[in-house]
């Protein structure tokens, strides 16, 4: 990053610098393919036959040259899946290697302006508002929901649609990066990628692209979502009838998320001609990645107006149609919606209050609304089964790929996964699902060690004793056990219901992110 900042200082302001020459810098590809920095602890590093995880600058230059040649894509289409990893020559010409190499390297480059903006914005915030540091945690969204949602009536689950064509994503990026060669290279790459996949799968190009080029796709997609919200706020403030309200935007390198309150609806038949404001002072909006939640104290009809507005907004400004069914409207009470790895709902808790007046006493029945968050067990177990920690039914299995590691590394990996999950799900009011996940990971760790030593999991657990259990504890659980002495000393079997929202989490846990 220091070298990148030095380059940008030599070439002008961050908004007008040229990113294209960075494609020819060796350290860019070292950074792009450094699995120690970019991979998750939940997944094993991807190792390709004939590829040493380091991009040669000569290969990169050849790759850019071959992008403009038709025969590259002919070779890619003719390559079979069986020969994709068979050798360096076939692997170089495979479309998987082509797309991965270009997209990962290019995504690192286009993230540079946003990373610098993030650093500069955080420095300014620390000078002006020192207490705003806690708002960077995505867990700060849940106290916001606890404070605002319990007295509202309706909630709308919104899945922000993907643009039909990748060109929409490039056009959105033009407002952020003013480097014509880089944008031209990106557009040419996406165009060739679309033509290549048209031979294989019809009408699924953007889906295939999102699976094979996750980092670049999420960067482009979140740029588009950020642009949606920017235009949305701009239109809202454009009308003199709409009062200005507080809003906060949170920027991360490849994930954007925001939190706004008191948003006012703008219903438009034609955005270029007429603005018809509809005011709702009790509308709240939160979003993370492609999932947004709208909650209102208004009627069901008002929520339908919101849905109508959003459908027309995407149609007129981004030129694609969004199906209304992607925005479900439900009454907030006793309805559960999935958001950021939690199953959230507003519950009605009945209470009986005893009122004493002189010699007479009587009971008053009252209901209190309470915002509740729990862990969805079945989706999380399904996520664990995808990465081979357990079966689909939740039966723990060994991790063969980790059996060659040392005992310390195996225990450390499982312990980190368990602690990260516990840390992220510390806000759940019911911990039974979390205890089951810990049990699965602990037994999977024991079976992996038993597989390595050609022993049984029971014998290994008896030999290690409580030493293995302590690796799966978090600092929060040890703190709770100290503060609340009634709970058992081992949170794995405890029954405490205390919720803790962490203020140091800037992204969703990777295992949870698979089911969002």
From Swiss-Prot:
Keyword Plastid: yes
Organism: Medeola virginiana
Cellular localization per UniProt: Plastid, Chloroplast
Entry similarity comment: Belongs to the intron maturase 2 family. MatK subfamily.
Lineage summary: Eukaryota, Viridiplantae, Streptophyta, Embryophyta, Tracheophyta
Name of the gene encoding the protein in the UniProt record: matK
GO BP annotations listed: mRNA processing; RNA splicing; tRNA processing
Name of the protein: Maturase K
InterPro entries: Domain_X, Maturase_MatK, Maturase_MatK_N
GO cellular component: chloroplast
PANTHER family: MATURASE K
Keywords, ordered alphabetically: Chloroplast, mRNA processing, Plastid, RNA-binding, tRNA processing
């Amino acid at each position: 990053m220091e070298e990148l900042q030095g380059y940008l200082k030599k070439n002008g302001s961050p908004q007008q610098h040229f990113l294209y020459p960075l494609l020819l810098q060796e350290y860019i590809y070292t950074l792009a393919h450094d699995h120690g920095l970019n991979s998750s602890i939940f997944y094993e590093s991807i190792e390709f036959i004939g590829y040493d995880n380091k991009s040669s600058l000569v290969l990169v230059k050849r790759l850019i040259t071959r992008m403009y040649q038709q025969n590259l894509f002919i070779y890619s289409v003719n390559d079979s899946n069986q020969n994709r990893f068979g050798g360096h020559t076939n692997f170089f010409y495979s479309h998987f290697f082509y797309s991965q190499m270009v997209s990962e390297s290019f995504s690192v480059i286009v993230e540079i302006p946003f990373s610098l903006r993030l650093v500069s914005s955080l420095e300014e915030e620390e000078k002006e508002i020192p207490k705003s540091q806690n708002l960077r945690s995505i867990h700060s969204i849940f106290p916001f929901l606890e404070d605002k949602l319990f007295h509202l009536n309706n909630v709308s689950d919104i899945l922000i649609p993907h643009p039909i064509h990748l060109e929409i994503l490039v056009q959105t990026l033009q407002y952020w990066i003013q480097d014509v060669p880089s944008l031209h290279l990106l557009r040419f790459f996406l165009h060739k990628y679309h033509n290549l996949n048209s031979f294989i799968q019809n009408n699924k190009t953007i889906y295939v692209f999102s699976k094979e080029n996750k980092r670049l796709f999420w960067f482009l997609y979140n740029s588009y979502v950020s642009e949606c919200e920017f235009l949305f706020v701009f239109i809202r403030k454009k009308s003199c009838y709409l009062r200005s309200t507080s809003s906060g935007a949170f920027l991360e390198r490849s994930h954007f998320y925001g939190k706004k309150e008191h948003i006012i609806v703008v219903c438009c038949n034609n955005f270029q001609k007429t603005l018809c404001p509809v005011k709702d002072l009790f509308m709240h909006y939160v979003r993370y990645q492609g999932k947004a939640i709208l909650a209102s104290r208004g009627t069901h009809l008002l929520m339908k107006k919101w849905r109508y507005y959003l459908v027309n907004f995407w149609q007129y400004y981004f030129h694609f149609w969004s199906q209304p069914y992607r925005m479900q409207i439900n009454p907030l009470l006793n309805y559960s919606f999935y958001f950021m790895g939690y199953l959230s709902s507003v519950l009605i808790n009945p209470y009986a209050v005893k009122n004493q007046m002189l010699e007479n006493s009587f009971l008053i029945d009252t209901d209190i609304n309470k915002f509740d968050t729990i862990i969805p067990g079945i989706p999380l177990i399904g996520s664990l089964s995808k990465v081979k920690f357990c079966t689909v039914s939740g039966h723990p299995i060994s991790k063969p790929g980790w059996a060659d590691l040392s005992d310390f590394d195996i225990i450390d990996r499982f312990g980190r996964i368990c602690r990260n999950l516990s840390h992220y799900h510390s806000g759940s009011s019911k911990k039974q699902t979390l205890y089951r996940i810990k049990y699965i990971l602990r037994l999977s760790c024991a079976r992996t060690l038993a597989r390595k030593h050609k022993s049984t999991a029971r014998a290994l657990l008896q030999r290690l004793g409580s030493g293995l259990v302590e690796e799966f504890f978090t600092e929060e659980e040890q703190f709770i056990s100290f503060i609340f002495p009634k709970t058992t000393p081992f949170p794995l079997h405890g029954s405490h219901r205390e919720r803790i929202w962490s203020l140091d989490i800037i992204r969703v846990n990777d295992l949870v992110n698979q089911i969002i």
